[in-house]
Amino acid sequence: MINRAGLLITFLMGGLTVLLWAVVNQPDVEPPWPTTIQGFCFSPMRATQTPMKGQFPSTAEIDEDLALLAGEAFAVRTYTVESTLGEVAPLAGAHQLNVMLGAWISQNEAENKAEIEKLIKVYRENHDHVVRVIVGNEALLRGDQTVEQMIDHLKRVRADIWAPVSLAEPWHIWLQYPELVKHVDFIAVHILPYWEGIDVEKAVDYVVFRYEQLKTAYPDKRIVIAEVGWPSNGRTRKGAQATLANQAKFLRRFLAVAEREGYIYYIMEAFDQLWKRQLEGEAGTNWGVYNLDREPKFAFTTPVVRMPGWQGLVAISIGLTVLLLAVMFRDSGGLMARGRGFLALVAYAITTFAVWMVWEYSRQYLTPATLAVGIMLFIAALGVIVVLLAEAHELAEAAWMRPWRNPARSIPASDEELPMVSVHVPAYNEPPDMMLQTLDALAVLNYPRFEVLVIDNNTKDAAVWQPVQAHCERLGAKFRFFHVDPLAGFKAGALNFALQQTDPNAEIVAVIDSDYIVKPDWLRDMVPYFSNPEMGIVQGPQDYRDAEQNAFKAMCMAEYRGFFHIGMITRNERNAIIQHGTMTLVRRRVLEEVGGWGEWCITEDAELGLRIFEQGHKATYIPQSYGKGLMPDNFADFKKQRFRWAYGAVLILRHHLAELLGMVPSRLTRGQRYHFIAGWLPWLADGFNLAFNLGALAWTVSMLFWPDSIPPPNILFALLPLSLFVFKLIKMLFLYRRRVAATLRQSLAAGLAGLSLSHTIARAMLTGFITRKIGFFRTPKFASNSALLRSLMDAREELLFLLALSLAIVGLFLVRDDSDMMDIRVWSLVLGVQGIPYLAALLVAFIGGLPKLPARLVGAMN
């Protein structure tokens, strides 16, 4: 249940959230919209219509639109007389609207001739209210016509009509071609600050500046601003943000200036035009003052707010956060106020961002395609959010728990009370000298009753296993050696064989790897925890003794240390530790009741622990080191070891999914289910991240080949993976300093080593979803240190991904003309961040290929 501190923090953070939304949406008082403006750019296409496919509105639909604008404007500007759009002029006259009549000029001269002939005809039939004529819209800007061709068209039209004639082009075209001016009756100029990346706060001044620039250059020509406006949605162009609030601000401010200065202008535009998305992207659809349903998009007279109706959005955000915190605080009795506050901050930030993300995406006109893309992106974003919340929860519990609620407790026992222990040491093709050290350490255990069973399975070379057999005979009756060949089931098969050979009086089974040298008090200190009859497992940490050998092993040591001093501690709070196949003790009765070690799973230790939990038994984790083994000698073995762990995790999830989700009866608690799912989420995220990278590369290649039609992904969705990466980095550095007592160098080394395994884990995750069995891989001991080139070759897949991502980034800046836009830069940053794990793999492989690089460069952790 949520205690009073949790409730107080929830409500306080809720209040701060409301305040934040209120500050962001503080009303801006802007000049009121005039009763009647001078003119609208008029394209009456509806949602399903596009002139690009010859789909035009009916005469009745055009008349409805003109009736809506009557009284709102004095005039409308048209762009073509094609099809029913030639009826705009007569229909406008019926609504007392003047017309600036336009003809569309393209590269097709036959079509241009027909368009001009119809333009002249429409003008002559409606000359009483057609006040100006435009021949061509940005034909020079597009490169469809030359200056000489446009002059010929102007001469042709001016010869047959008596209204003022011009062509419509942006301001720079008029300055670039002064020879045009003497062939027009007025200058029809487009001044659109958004396309030029001008901040909305400077946009009106920019329009005035360009207007005055033209006025100075051509003092004898009247200037008509044929297009001026701001889109309500679209890509951010330098300082120009396309938002509804910015559209309202710009237009209301401009209209006030235009009225004061006496400008002749046409607002771009009356209605949103969905068909323009193909030409101009999302911004092209959103220039209208009215939306597709012919409703005003913003307030004309009242103050402007950034997000109209934000009160409802903040209510949704707070409601979602309260539900989220009710779950996160459900089992957090020992969490300090700082931890609760941190979780509340993260929860409110995430829900606020999620609500804003959905609202922002929904502002666009959703087609079936954009809706499908949005759903896929939202599902991906939801996955990132879940991982981020799980990471935040672990950080809070690791940093701010008081005190630990589930500390291990043992009852001192006399020698007579201590149960017999059977120590099992599985081995396959292990160096005999190393094995002798392991056995010598076991021989001096300070424990009254124990036996040691060494099971060598499937080693072919007798010179490897016979010295171990002889040494067991020398150590006496407590040591028994078994060489079995063939023996199925890998390590689990060997352990099950040992269980069959175990002394009937043994109550506890202890397992260590063949390279571990244990301390004499290992069993004496650990076995008393079984005085609790519910205790099924007592687990110690994995630890290593060769961290000082070189820099590579020092990095590996730092990476291993994090889980055993952070993750296992927090999992122990809810009786949800991961059992490891070394330094572990299991109650024999429990081991036999659950069916022994699972020979189907290559991570038989973790799978056994989960089965024991499913039967309702307890486990405890003792963070003190009682034995040390050997780490992988090179990067290839480091990767293979982690591949096996990650692959086994997927198999366990698949095999036990029904129990973990509560779909079949078991005695798993909610906390255990949470930790087993949430604990493997980061690995699952690595798998999805690989799929994301492949998709990102494919999308970027499409952006390079079809730059005009394939935009970069929405910035909102790009921000989430960036946020997760930064959060995980900060979390790792913070907890390593706080819980592992690592230096900054050691923390960074641990992070680098962990990142270097991301691709390996991703491959293991994806492989685990499509296969059910893969061969067991033992971690070699005293393997040859890889030469540098060989070590780098072990990271060849990562190198290919790094090169692909790097080339994608370079391509964006070399190929795309819009590479200076915010979304391109953000997407490039995403690609760069996605490349960091691959770069980390190359760096770790490089370090692993230099076995003489001293450990002091990292700082060995003892």
Where are these regions (language model features)?
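Membrane-embedded multi-pass helical conduit in multi-pass membrane proteins
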Residues: G334-V386, A413, P682-G775, S791-N862
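Aromatic-rich peripheral "rim/lid" segments of glycoside hydrolase catalytic domains that contact
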Residues: P31, A47, P51-G54, T236-L244, ...
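Aromatic- and acid-rich polysaccharide-binding/catalytic face
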Residues: H95, L101, V131, E169-R210, ...
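A conserved acidic beta->alpha catalytic loop
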Residues: P448, D456-V468, D485-A488
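Short, acidic, metal-binding catalytic loop of nucleotide-sugar glycosyltransferases
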Residues: L439-R449
